[in-house]
Curated annotation (Swiss-Prot):
GO annotations of cellular component type: cytoplasm; ribonucleoprotein complex
VWFA-like domain: annotated span: 465-643
InterPro entries reported in the protein's UniProt record: TROVE2, TROVE_dom, TROVE_dom_sf, vWA_Ro60, vWFA_dom_sf
Segments for region (RNA-binding): 186-390
First-listed, main subcellular location of the protein, grouped into a coarse class: cytoplasm
Encoding gene per record: rop-1
Name this polypeptide is given: RNA-binding protein RO60
Domain of life the protein comes from: Eukaryota
Residue span(s) of domain TROVE: 63-473
Subcellular localization: Cytoplasm
Biological role stated in the UniProt entry: RNA-binding protein that binds to misfolded non-coding RNAs, pre-5S rRNA, and several small cytoplasmic RNA molecules known as Y RNAs.
Domain notes: The horseshoe-shaped TROVE domain is built with 7 helical HEAT-like repeats, and is closed by the VWFA-like domain giving rise to a ring-shaped monomer. Single-stranded RNA is bound in the positively charged central cavity.
Length: 643
């Protein structure tokens, strides 16, 4: 059963027909907006009002750009994609755990308010279906905005056609967003995050003296109920037990707010899994199960009926439903989970893992220091990402004997398994750095690294190049060689140099046209080819002279030498500019001189906390601060022109 919830969640194919009604409503609203371009609609005291359109205020520090040069314009679609993938509608990605707020999404809100909600949800659904977003928070936040924006009393009709059209648009937008919940919120963690964002948006978008909205109207209740009722019983049991609570929310909270009632569905009464599902719903609310009906005495049945759903009791259970409950694997899993909460016996825990396919999250915390428990978790087909994440823990408890080490080496160097698991090379490089250092960043966990595993992680890094698809672009990769590049990347065991050389090797191996240069206050061409290993590259760079950092040099060098590149990637630690020409100006001059008007530049400052080189109005510039597992996918999306 654990296989149903593998580490990588497959998304379904996007069905555009599901958004057809919203598309038609949007088109009608935009036609009306074109006729009344001097007004806009807002919510005042819970009602829609027409107000004169205001010129957008120029933000503090913004000035009109008269510098000239070629600028690659940013469309509304690009801004939406940037927000969904980067977590920002500007040309920047910040490796940070900070929570997204309504202030981060003002441009997205403006696009929706202008009647383009269909485009926003279409982009969201497509990116989600293709698994193009490396993180879920911006995706879920956008879905919550679409589900809660401009909440008003939809029962009141006015004599103004435009207000009525806007009201229809908002209602269709809310309905379409709620319909997407099962596809976007694939785990309870996502669902809890969505609900939390909805509550935040409801509170922060109250206008004037509007009465506070709980956010739990009929549509919201039905959507949350549907998330639970459409799961198979075995998958629902796994979800309820593996993810009992997150983000300050629990399944019990959602059930008490959404009031899902299985008997509201006409088909439920005749469903074979009716009793099984009613038991799971009880577990979600009460945290326990009642004895299965086939095993109850008459007295026990009478006691249970006192607290059971009265609607359910009106319809007798069929023989098939009683048999299904009695033999239920889903209920067996929940019972095993409940029994293990205070279990101390390793033998009992191990037997439960083998019988029910339990995963780490099901087990009591005290058992996670057991060698036998980890041996069993590994042996019952541990998913690749879970195996990589737990290498250190399994080494500490002594669970990795020679046979299991050989198994790990085989899996890490199996290109087909790496392909199926979609493990990016950088994830393996990072895992190697974590494992090889023999200690954790938090707590007192230390271990003696197994050299075979270290070597396999590096070998897997090269094998996993298949998971970094080529873009067909011409690259100039510029590596800062200043001494500070040996320091660690923010929130990572990799040094800035290791991260830069790792990313560079992926491009060198997978792309047809790549040139590497080293820069500080001067520029040096590098002899790297796809045959070089990461150790060779690091040793070579370590022997170069270094000075101050001039991030404009690579573009200036390419301009002066009439070289043709589609993409410049600047790898540095913290200093982003110390030269005569700003990178912002250097790329514009390069575009003008080369005729490659959509040439792109990425400045990756891996230790910086907050900086901005990119012009947010230029779709060909991207800032990245910090470095994490999301960066490679973000770079690919940017280079291929998708954000």
């Amino acid at each position: 059963m654990a296989d149903e919830l593998n580490e990588f969640q497959e998304a379904g194919n996007f069905n555009e027909e599901a958004l057809m009604r919203l598309s038609n409503v949007c088109a009608r609203l935009r036609r009306m907006q074109m006729l009344e371009s001097d007004v806009e609609i807002t919510v005042v005291d819970g009602e829609l009002k027409r107000v004169p359109r205001q010129m957008e205020k120029v933000k503090d520090g913004q000035v009109e750009n008269n510098a000239g040069g070629f600028v690659f314009p940013v469309s509304d679609e690009t801004q939406v994609r940037r927000f969904l993938i980067l977590g920002s509608d500007k040309g920047s990605y910040h490796q940070s755990s900070e929570k997204i707020t309504i202030d981060n999404a003002q441009r997205i809100i403006k696009i929706i308010e202008q009647g383009n909600g269909h485009m926003v949800l279409k982009e969201l659904a497509l990116i989600n279906a293709e698994n193009r977003n490396p993180k879920m928070n911006a995706m879920i936040f956008t879905l919550a905005i679409c589900a809660r924006i401009s909440t008003h009393d939809t029962t009141k009709k006015t004599e103004c056609p435009m207000l009525n059209a806007y009201s229809d648009y908002i209602r269709a937008l809310h309905d379409s967003a709620l319909d997407l919940i099962p596809e976007v919120c694939r785990t309870p963690t996502h669902l809890f995050e969505f609900v939390d964002y909805c509550q935040t948006i409801s509170e922060s978008t109250k206008a004037g003296g509007a009465k506070s909205s709980t956010g739990w109207g009929r549509s919201m209740r039905n959507a949350i109920s549907k998330w639970y009722t459409t799961k198979t019983t075995e998958k629902l049991a796994m979800l309820l037990t593996k993810y009992p609570q997150r983000e300050g929310w629990s399944h019990r909270d959602l059930f008490r707010l959404a009031h899902p009632n299985l008997m509201d569905s006409r088909s439920h009464g005749q469903s074979e899994d009716r009793l099984e599902r009613e038991q799971l719903f009880r577990f979600a609310v009460k945290g326990d199960l009642v004895k299965r009906k086939r095993k109850m005495s008459v007295e026990e049945v009478a006691e249970v009926e006192k607290v059971w759903d009265k609607k359910a009791l009106k319809l007798p259970y069929t023989e098939e439903q009683l048999i299904k409950e009695e033999q239920s694997r889903a209920l067996n899993l929940v019972e095993a989970y409940l029994k293990l909460k205070n279990e101390q016996s390793e033998e009992v825990i191990v037997a439960a893992i083998k019988k029910h396919g339990l995963v780490r999250e099901h087990l009591p915390t005290t058992s996670l220091n057991s060698k036998l428990v980890w041996e069993t978790l590994f042996d019952v087909s541990m998913p690749m990402t879970a195996m990589i994440r737990n290498l250190a823990k399994m080494t500490v408890v002594g669970a990795l004997d020679e046979k299991r080490v050989d198994n790990i080496v085989k899996r890490l160097t199996d290109q087909e398994e790496l392909r199926r698991s979609r493990i990016h090379p950088i994830n393996l490089l990072t895992a190697r750095a974590v494992y090889a250092q023999g200690r954790g960043d938090k707590g007192s966990l230390t271990w003696e690294p197994n050299q075979k595993i270290c070597d396999a992680l590096e070998a897997g890094f090269y094998k996993a190049f298949v998971n970094a698809p080529p873009t067909g672009k011409r690259y100039c990769l510029a590596l800062d060689v200043s001494g500070s590049m040996t320091s660690r990347v923010s929130s990572s065991p990799l040094s800035c140099r290791e991260a830069a050389t790792g990313m560079s090797l992926i491009n060198l191996h997978n792309e047809a046209e790549v040139r590497c240069v080293a820069f500080c206050d001067k520029l040096t061409e590098l002899p790297f080819t796809k045959d070089w290993k990461i150790g060779q590259v690091n040793d070579y760079v370590n022997n170069l002279d270094f000075g101050r950092t001039d991030c404009g040099l690579p573009m200036t060098w390419a301009t002066e030498n009439n070289l043709k590149f589609d993409v410049f990637i600047i790898y540095t630690d913290n200093d982003t500019w110390a030269g005569e020409i700003h990178p912002f100006e250097a790329i514009k001059k390069y575009r003008e001189a080369s005729g490659i008007h959509d040439a792109k530049v990425i400045v990756m400052a891996m230790q910086a906390y907050d900086y901005s080189i990119a012009d947010p109005s230029d779709a060909g510039m991207l800032d990245i601060t910090g470095f994490d597992s999301a960066v490679p996918q973000i770079v690919h999306e940017f280079v291929t022109g998708k954000i």
